[in-house]
Amino acid sequence: MKYKRRGLIAGASASLLVSRSAWAEKDTVRIAVQPGLTYLALNIVEHQHLIEQHAAAAGLPNVRAEFVRLAAGNNVNDAVISGAVDIGATGVPPFLTLWSKTRGSVDVRAMTPYNSMPLVLVTRNPAVKRIEDLGPKDRIALPGVGSSSQAVMLQMAAARAFGQAEFRRFDPLTVTRGHPDAMAALLSNTEIDCHFSTAPYLQQELAVPGVHVLLTSTDVYGGPGTVGITFTTKKFREANPKLEAAFIASMDQAFRTIHEDRRAAAEAYVAVSGDKLSIEQVESYISDPSMVYEITPRGTMKVAAFMYKTGTIKVMPDDWKALFVSEMWGYAGS
């Protein structure tokens, strides 16, 4: 009987361990980001260890956040779907494509925006003053042909300028380049004479004589609009509710830091980005009124409607809340 009792206790203990293991949240959360000041809020989250702090406050004291840097939104999407990372940061169009494709399976949802700062198309071609002047010899560098935020913004601008049927008018002019490589090409007199840019590359490009603006995402949106969001899978959300909440709280705190302490925000960017910019330069960039960082989703349905109309996504979301986790529904999004 003693042996049997010990066996029962051992069995119960094992069951308890299995149960605890099955319900335990992850102790390492991996987040994929891309280069540039677009990701400033995430840089702050990384530098100040905000996920670890908020997770500890929620009863998860041993959490560690790892940040992985990838070149383009499609790479981020692939990393999330494969399970290589838990949370991705990508443009609204790449996310919408993934959201449409994974409904009923992986079922991705947006967690938070990470900025509403403008994406800006610049050129060094003196003959091109507006997008209507772009010709067959021009080449536009952007992070992903046909799929990135910049690519879809260019299509939306083409549809507005030439009619809906002409939305792909500029697609043959586009080439895939990460922002650092695109800036180098633009300023080195290569065949690439246009770059759909973002900070801090934009400010460095515009400092060069002859480089000028053709189009901004603000023009396309008709005002500030979310250009990037963080997202994750149903599997991660259901298995890690405290981590999900900790991440959202971390992003909210990071946005407050940007508005209340730009110096600290600039220090975080310089510390983790690898960009060879001074803290003073970065602080001046993010102090520009056009650099909008906020947690409220804006304009996502406008992009979704365009992508649905062109057939890029097969499902039209009922409203912006269909795209985001329920924790975000209290915001006045669009």
Regions found by a protein language model. Name each.
Residues G83, K101, N189-T190, D261, ...:
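Generic structural signal for alpha-helix termini and adjacent loop/cap motifs
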Residues G163, D171, H179-A271:
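Pocket-lining segment of extracytoplasmic ligand-binding domains
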Residues L60-E66, A165-P172, S273-S284, K314-W320:
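Short, surface-exposed acidic
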Residues M307-S334:
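Conserved C-terminal helix/tail region of periplasmic/extracytoplasmic solute-binding proteins
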Residues M1-Y3:
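Positively charged n-region of N-terminal signal peptides that target proteins for export
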Residues E238-K314:
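Secondary-structure end/capping motifs
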Residues E25-F167, P172-T176, D193-A199, G223-P224:
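Short, glycine-/small- and polar/acidic-enriched structural segments
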Residues G7-A24:
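N-terminal export signals
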